[in-house]
Amino acid sequence: MLSQLFSSCFLGMKTPLQAQQNCSFPQRRTFSVEDNKIRIYTPEVEDTVKLLVASDTHLWMSDERENDFQKFSKRMSDAYHVTRHYDTKEDTNPEKAFLETISKASNLKVDAIALLGDIFSYPSEAAIEWAAKNLNDSGIPYYYVCGNHDWHYEGMPGPLKDLRQKWINNRLLKMFHGNDPMKYFVDLKGMRLLFIDNSTYEISYEQLMFLQQQIETKKPLIVMMHIPLYATGRNVGFGCAHPDWKSSNDHSFELEKREPWPRDGHSPVTFKFREEIINAPNVLAVFAGHIHKQSLDVMKGVPQFVTQYNACGAFYDVVIIPQRAISVK
């Protein structure tokens, strides 16, 4: 059954499943996954694009500038000192993993590195400066979007949206190269990458409008964000537009010392955002992190790839490859 579904949606073969699935793509595309290697084949691009996608490094380094904030950063600064390498199974740590990832990107000769949030366990000036320097020294273009930890000082009073804006402006702007941290796009060889901040689990009206405008361009799109979209059967870790995302299911707000999720769950805008993505004919894929485990879901023909956490060295090696359209009579 699974193989039939994939051939129906991605290769254009006519099967009875087409009556049950939304497979009406204007172009035919397919993909393959082997370990951390993802290959997307589509006639919608004319040149090969190579990406390294990483998320959740959880860099925690601090210096004397952190002294006044230690009560807000203590829990996360005590975490991820030693991790287990995803491949060698040997002990490693976030700094080693991050440097190794940059080296891998260089060896793979990627066109860009996409960093999908929680690169930092809290907005540490030392960690942000260290990461930015190593990325800049590599000479590889890199693009970043925030996760829920990058800007969060646990226990600091205030609404999450206000705290996010404050600490992005005060600490993280150097990671964005002048782009709008909430939403921006990057064009690579005719393909467009969309970076959208959903680190509060919610989407703003401005972000929804941005997405709709990008879909209207008809350019081939890849959506990059931290928190995965809800997929059928997934838990609230896949929290962007999850129907069970609400205060009654928020079991971490006391641990993370933040506001609980809203009692009534997501806004209609967030649900609309998900629907726009999975129904868009020109969205090739979604990439996300957050849950620290590798996963794949396909929603109305749109694959969502979630990467394992980079604190253990994991990343996705992604190649988008031109493919001549398949003619089906």
Placement of each model-derived feature along the sequence:
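N-terminal active-site segment of His-dependent metallophosphoesterases
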Residues: A19-E125
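Extended active-site neighborhood of metal-dependent phosphoesterases/phosphodiesterases
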Residues: S32-V45, E125-I222, K246-S248, L255-E256, ...
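N-terminal export signals
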Residues: M1-K14
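Residue-level marker for buried hydrophobic side chains located in beta-strands
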Residues: L51-V53, L115, Y144, V223, ...
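Active-site glycine-centered loops adjacent to acidic/histidine catalytic or metal-binding residues
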Residues: D56, D118, G147-N148, H226, ...
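Surface-exposed cleft-lining segments at the edges of enzyme active sites
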Residues: D87, G117-F120, M191-E202, P260-W261
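Charged, glycine/proline-rich intrinsically disordered loops and linkers
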Residues: E66-T88, K161-L172, G239-R263
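His/acidic metal-ligating clusters that form di-metal
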Residues: N93, F98-A112, R192, Y201-K300
